[in-house]
């Protein structure tokens, strides 16, 4: 899910270092559910029934086939527009990853720091500083304001940051803009997986959760396609950054019509609003049971919204925080950003000299893997996908090590390197990317979910920065083969960790998972 190359810079021939008005509570719940009513009515129309028939000379009736056999499973459709709006934040995340891939050279030339690799790296990496701060403050803010309002508040730095960057005429201005964008991304990337896990019906929570990864992939691909004219127009980067403000407006507007999390509504005592959301998203038959489960969890853990950071040191929260932080450390140290960076040089060796074209191949592979994950995650489960993903990444790394470290025909070596790179990206996208961000809120308690996700993502950003900081030094000192072998070894370690410490959450409601953790500190 979370792929970014925020420190390393690629050049073809070298490596270098709003304000919104809010309707009344119940009125909003009814208005926001208009999406859901439309899609639920469409779902009913899709049902196909069959009639029993009997020929005059038949001795036996042909039994009618139950309608369910032919019914399309569209139970996810009511929640889809709401979680799609939230996933616009991931589209922005992906867009801002890709938007600096090529134009950084033109930006440096126009703003007067061309050739200074430290300043070029700072323009790219200050994004991480903002994202780190955003991830820390996201949890307390969502506890206080709810998901919809927090989303909308933090579209402000996303929009302002893009506009400030687009109009920048000095290094300070571009740094300010990039920091603001990072701040907004840091908050929203924490909110999206939590929002989806709390709004989506249990049966479809995994498939809808992969929209985070899909949104990121689409954002990267769109930014790469939009960046093609930048090769001929040195000022095109301003247009690209102006365009970056538009999804922020769409996110803010869309959240005005999206539903609030029913679990958050219950926490703050808005039971009537929560029932309206559940009825329209999950179905009328789920209302009483869902509210009963919510209240049961609150009775066990307390309904006080102001959970403290120190609570993450107590069981079972400490175990979930440990799993969340460890999964993100392993994800980043398995080398996703290093592989993405070096993939441009790998493609260049086989004649694909355009960095944008090489990145597009990688982006499409990433997108294909995310689509496969959306199909498999609620069938095979989170744990199997996570383990299989890391095993696939390990095999891919060792294949590249073999290709670059052993005396092979040059064409064969290059072909194996390309194959290994694409296999690695696909394997990442099918498990390590989407599952990591999804399983952490699923395991977290309702009381501490925001803070655990904030902690986990802050670890993600620190790990991301460290990998980006040292990757090129390690490659220059030890060679690509050694570094990639270490990535493969970390991938094997991540597969073992996933087997030993993660638990399967497929098909379980968040309340069932939380009660199991509270009662046994484990899930069998």
Curated annotation (Swiss-Prot):
Q: Specify the domain of life of the species encoding this protein.
A: Eukaryota
Is NAD set as a keyword in this record?
no
- Location of this chain's protein in the cell: Plastid, Chloroplast membrane
Q: Which UniProt keywords apply?
A: Chloroplast, Membrane, Plastid, Sugar transport, Transmembrane, Transmembrane helix, Transport
Predominant location category: plastid
TM annotation in the entry = 88-108, 122-142, 151-171, 179-199, 208-228, 239-259, 320-340, 357-377, 386-406, 420-440, 452-472, 483-503
Keyword Plastid in annotation = yes
Spell out the molecular function terms from Gene Ontology: transmembrane transporter activity
Q: Gene3D superfamilies given for it?
A: MFS general substrate transporter like domains (1.20.1250.20)
Pfam families registered for this protein in UniProt: Sugar_tr (PF00083)
- Give the family this protein belongs to, as stated in its UniProt record: Belongs to the major facilitator superfamily. Sugar transporter (TC 2.A.1.1) family.
Q: What is the recorded function of this protein according to its Swiss-Prot or TrEMBL entry?
A: May be involved in the efflux of glucose towards the cytosol.
PANTHER family to which the protein is assigned, alphabetical: PLASTIDIC GLUCOSE TRANSPORTER 1-RELATED, SOLUTE CARRIER FAMILY 2
* Protein name per the record: Probable plastidic glucose transporter 1
Q: Please report the organism this UniProt entry assigns to the protein.
A: Arabidopsis thaliana
